[in-house]
Amino acid sequence: MDKQRAVHVYKVLAACLAAALVLGACASTARRVAVPYAISFTADAQVNPDANGRPSPIQITVYELKSASTFKARDYFALQSNPQAALGAELLNTDQIILQPGQTEVIKHAGNVDAGAIGIVASYRDLEDSQWRLTVPLPEAENTNIYKFWQFSPNEQTVQIAVNRSGLAVTGWDRPWWPF
C-alpha cells in the first residue's frame, strides 16, 4: 500500500510541476505594457482660411516621441521636410491626415512603452498668426503584475484635439474608469 501511495504522490507532484511549467511558458515576460491611445481631431468649419476667407483643408502630422523637448525646439520647416533628421532618436512614429473643414477623424495607436508624448503639427496657410504646433503627454506604460496569467491589457485612452480657425487645442481626455 505504501508503494502505491508513493507512486500517487509522485504523479501528483509531476502533474503540479507540468502545470507550473505550462503556466510559466504562457506568461508574458514584459515588465511594462503600453497604453493604447486614440487621437480624435475635429476641424472647425472655418479652419485654415485662404486669402478670400474661405475655409480650406488642412494637413495634420502626428509625431510619436520619446519626449517633447527636441520637438518643441524645431521649426515648422525642419519638422515637415525631414522629421527623422530634425528629431533623431526621439522620433518613434509618424502619421499624417488631411482634414476637410468640419470633419472629424480618429487615429488609433497601440501605444509604445518608450513613448512619452505626441507632437502635432498643423499646416496652416498663415503660420505666423496660428498655433501650428501642439504637444500632448502620453499615459505612462503600466507595470505588469506578478500574476501574469491574470494580466489585463490597459484600456484605450482618447485625447480630443480641436483644429480651430488658427490653432490647435486639446479639448479633453477620455480615460476609462474601469481598469480592464
Q: What are the functions of these language-model segments?
A:
Residues D2-A14:
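Bacterial N-terminal signal peptides that target proteins for export
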Residues V33-Y37:
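Short structural boundary motif marking the start of a folded domain
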Residues I39-A51:
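Short amphipathic, basic-aromatic surface patches that mediate peripheral association
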Residues R133-F180:
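Glycine-rich, aromatic-bearing surface loops/beta-hairpins
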Residues N52-T61:
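Short coil-to-beta strand junction motifs in C2/discoidin
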Residues Q59, L65-G119, Y124-L127:
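Structured domain cores in non-transmembrane regions
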Residues A27-A30:
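Bacterial signal peptide processing site
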Residues V22-A25:
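C-terminal motif of bacterial Sec signal peptides marking the signal peptidase cleavage site
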